């Protein structure tokens, strides 16, 4: 009986969420056009916060219903469908099929097959499989059109980069987890050629493919692992220095200038220095981000700084330290060691200017009951294990680390913890220098 009662609750919650979603579509002027076109405008970070929450709520409830109702055969079929869909999107991306189809209108299957030099029959079989999941359409035999979903992979190439990384790197690393575990435990069983231990797959990245791999990894971080703490801005807007005239902000370990561009547009007197992460100096940002090396803004300056070295800018009001992640082709220490080194590198400027603040941004663990967010957090954790032999840092470990950073005159103390209101899975820790005599 308890299961039936819970099912009724989920059905009621789903009805409420769908009603809210329809209201958001109408409120934001999306009442015209096809339903898929209307809903597609609720994708991505640019969607209004209320619309994003309504869509997320509906998806969370659908996930709960699927968990409750699915049996073993359903699970196996779902895995099979997702495997085939991934294979199809990789194939379509490799042969650049989405780019061959006009965003408005249709293309003949025959013309596309001749353009990419593959048999029309094979192209048709792959398109039809992808179409079962809403990626591309075959409105009539022999014709291909974009769906709202597939069109987004053309207008925003970082989605395709993320999918290619998943197919070519993340999925093989995940499937090699058994062999990796056995070898770490001392088994004599030979591992596949793709398995790299100690520092993970990234430590042996193919240098000839490094730029492509780094670009794809940045896209996968954002879209596949929901690692958004390095671009989220909403939890920074409550910082008092941002509203001060001519305030100087330094962003440490940035992977793009996206956050800087957003904040200088929001605060017209803000001056921003972007200190790039090592990998971002080697790869260009995707279209979804902002290539820091190409930024031309009078209030944004781009620098290259070796992580953990003394901070050359001593007079900033805020130092935003981005949470470190492993990068292909870049030597890598553990996140805790890197964060500790960065905090110690910023002791001097905070000691000299007691008004200055460090803001450490990091991924946050979701609240209990948020099935979708918990799933994404587990994806991040296992992906770090499989790709770099790392794991997500717990908040308790970060707080313990903060409490241990100091010098002969004082130490760093946590003064505020800010969570993103936009469901971005991000937290910001506001840290100041406190003299031992001030306690």
Curated annotation (Swiss-Prot):
Residues 109-128 bind DNA. It comes from the Eukaryota. GO terms for molecular function: DNA binding. It is found in: Nucleus. Keywords: DNA-binding, Nucleus, Transcription, Transcription regulation. Its main location: nucleus. The keyword Transcription applies. Residues 79-149 form the HTH iclR-type domain. GO terms for cellular component: nucleus. Transcriptional coactivator; part of the gene cluster that mediates the biosynthesis of agnestins, dihydroxy-xanthone metabolites. This is Agnestins biosynthesis cluster transcriptional coactivator AgnL9. The gene is AgnL9.
